[in-house]
Amino acid sequence: FCRKMTQGKCKPVNTFGHESLANVQAVCSQKKVICKNGLSNCYQSNSAIHYTDCRKTGSSNYPNCAYKTTRAEKRIIVACEGNL
């Protein structure tokens, strides 16, 4: 999964959420929280979402990047603007 999703790039960390756009947008009407940057337009999801965390391993370099893949669930925080 990680290598296919990161073709053409070799970032140290990539995180991919496995939710529909509608489900992510719905978080904007859930629990309001303070953002890490101090702003007040962040919202936390009521339930956990499925995600995949991809972390570059060792000294692998582009174009042969290698990643450790971890699948998990956690609640997310999103910054919302306007109605989204």
UniProtKB/Swiss-Prot annotation:
Q: Its catalytic activity?
A: an [RNA] containing cytidine + H2O = an [RNA]-3'-cytidine-3'-phosphate + a 5'-hydroxy-ribonucleotide-3'-[RNA]; an [RNA] containing uridine + H2O = an [RNA]-3'-uridine-3'-phosphate + a 5'-hydroxy-ribonucleotide-3'-[RNA]
Please indicate if the UniProt record lists Lipid metabolism as a keyword: no
Q: Which PROSITE patterns match?
A: RNASE_PANCREATIC
Entries under Gene3D superfamilies matching the protein: Ribonuclease A-like domain (3.10.130.10)
Localization recorded for this chain is: Secreted
Q: Does the keyword Chaperone apply?
A: no
Under the heading SUPFAM superfamilies, the entry gives: RNase A-like
Cellular component, GO annotation: extracellular region
Self-association state and partner proteins as the record states: Homodimer; disulfide-linked.
**Major subcellular site:** secreted
- What family, per the record? Belongs to the pancreatic ribonuclease family.
* Keyword terms: Disulfide bond, Endonuclease, Hydrolase, Lyase, Nuclease, Secreted
> Where on this chain does substrate bind?
K11, P12, V13, N14, T15, K36, R55
Q: Which PANTHER family match?
A: RIBONUCLEASE, RIBONUCLEASE PANCREATIC
Per the UniProt entry, the disulfide pairs are C10-C65, C28-C80, C35-C42
Example of a GO MF term: nucleic acid binding
Using the UniProt record, name the top-level EC class of this enzyme in a single word. Answer: lyase
Tell me which Gene Ontology terms the entry assigns under biological process: defense response to Gram-positive bacterium
Supply the EC number(s): 4.6.1.18
Instruction: Provide the protein name.
Output: Seminal ribonuclease
